[in-house]
Amino acid sequence: MVNIRPDEISSIIRQQIDKYDQGVQVANVGTVLQIGDGIARVYGLDQVMAGELLEFEDETIGIALNLESDNVGVVLMGEGRAILEGSSVKATGKIAQVPVGDGYLGRVVNSLGAPIDGKGDISSSDTRLIESAAPGIISRKSVCEPIQTGITAIDSMIPIGRGQRELIIGDRQTGKTSVAIDTIINQKTEDVVCVYVAIGQKAASVASIVTQLEEKGALDYTVIVAANADEPATLQYIAPYTGAAIAEYFMYKGKATLIIYDDLSKQASAYRQMSLLLRRPPGREAFPGDVFYLHSRLLERAAKLSDALGGGSMTALPIIETQAGDVSAYIPTNVISITDGQIFLSGDLFNAGIRPAINVGISVSRVGSAAQIKAMKQVAGKLKLELAQFAELEAFSQFASDLDQATRNQLARGQRLREILKQPASSPISVEEQVAIIYTGINGFLDEVPVNKVKEFVSQLRTNLKNSKPKFAESIRETKALGSDAEELLKSAIADVKQSMG
């Protein structure tokens, strides 16, 4: 007969109990009621948060946007072709966030921060919420430093400051993206981190921008966030917020950042598509009622931080595409009212060969001369007025047959001023050279130069100042003002060029 030892049995049972460790997981799980057009209706997610990430059985991620009494409206961040009616959905307990870090510089990523340039994984040191609160009033400082675009017409008449939001608006094919890309290229010596967000663009267009930045050596300090035209509307909708989160990482580290949203019209269209599919009530132009908030909460994140927070800044250049120059449409008026000014690019000027095609009459910077160095204020003060008077006289002179000498002189000067503001793409001009060029035009030194020779004159003047009179640029860089010594050097350079051109 087997000898039973109760104490041994009880010790074995005790050991088994001690080892027993079944982790109990409480998951918030729902069931798919309906799926289609990138939208899922889910039943049973009672504890879900607005904007929470949900995971479907095929590992597709969605965002809970509509919380209704009997179901949840979820937008998918992927194709979701394997999701079936009746399949389960799990709440992750997380709000959409994106990895951030210095490793993102020089890379192309998608709306979720994953690399799409084939250069391998990105090591990230941190994560940031895609939607985060904008800095408050106490956290901010008024805009006081310029961000030089390298485009003479903008830096002189529509100056942009660090922490400002300046809208670039115009019809298709008027050079909006060129202005933004030139601004990125001009930051090479300025220690500014740039983020370019491409929304709903062709993959070929994004590839050409990457190549252009690489050729100019500007990709090293730039992050490109791309949500191409073939991607789901959800990814096009969150791309700008992802870009803002990456820029904020650098801003809160005390760096100056520049972010370009190209373009917010396509983001609004993607949001309209999502909202209509979620059956939210449509408003003007079929946009949902909160489309203003869509853009205001994004653009309010641009700021110049106070010294206590490190003094970093985020300058935003949103781009909006108009239809046939109609700036009074819904989205353009919304964004104009949110931003601190706009640069209006005109199709007529572009076709007339005036490039950049900036319509100076309705372009404005609400920060004004606070975002300019003293030297630029000294020379550019009269420029906008002169050009406005010239435009008026030019329209009038088409009907008048005989004009007095003063009017003819003003027209001649206006033509030369317009000529010096023309600038090819991807060729930014330093602020010292801009000051020299505007000084030459505004003080009548070009009045005797034939209009077709103005470009050559300006080119020779820049070469002369760079090679023979480097002290001119040094003086402006150090003092930020056009002193009497610098002015004498400039006058002597102008005289040299006039002599050499005969």
UniProtKB/Swiss-Prot annotation:
Gene that this sequence comes from: atpA
SUPFAM superfamilies reported in the protein's UniProt record: C-terminal domain of alpha and beta subunits of F1 ATP synthase, N-terminal domain of alpha and beta subunits of F1 ATP synthase, P-loop containing nucleoside triphosphate hydrolases
Biological function: Produces ATP from ADP in the presence of a proton gradient across the membrane. The alpha chain is a regulatory subunit.
Known partners and oligomeric status: F-type ATPases have 2 components, CF(1) - the catalytic core - and CF(0) - the membrane proton channel. CF(1) has five subunits: alpha(3), beta(3), gamma(1), delta(1), epsilon(1). CF(0) has four main subunits: a, b, b' and c.
InterPro entries linked to this entry: ATP_synth_asu-like_sf, ATP_synth_asu_C, ATP_synth_asu_C_sf, ATP_synth_F1_a_nt-bd_dom, ATP_synth_F1_asu, ATPase_a/bsu_AS, ATPase_F1/V1/A1_a/bsu_N, ATPase_F1/V1/A1_a/bsu_N_sf
Species annotation: Rhodomonas salina (Cryptomonas salina)
CDD domains: ATP-synt_F1_alpha_C, ATP-synt_F1_alpha_N, F1-ATPase_alpha_CD
Disulfide bonds: none
Record's subcellular location: Plastid, Chloroplast thylakoid membrane
UniProt xrefs under PANTHER family: ATP SYNTHASE SUBUNIT ALPHA, MITOCHONDRIAL
Name this polypeptide is given: ATP synthase subunit alpha, chloroplastic
Record family assignment: Belongs to the ATPase alpha/beta chains family.
Superkingdom, natural source: Eukaryota
Membrane topology: Peripheral membrane protein
Binding site for ATP: 170-177
Molecular function (Gene Ontology), one example: ATP binding
EC number: 7.1.2.2
Keyword RNA-binding: no
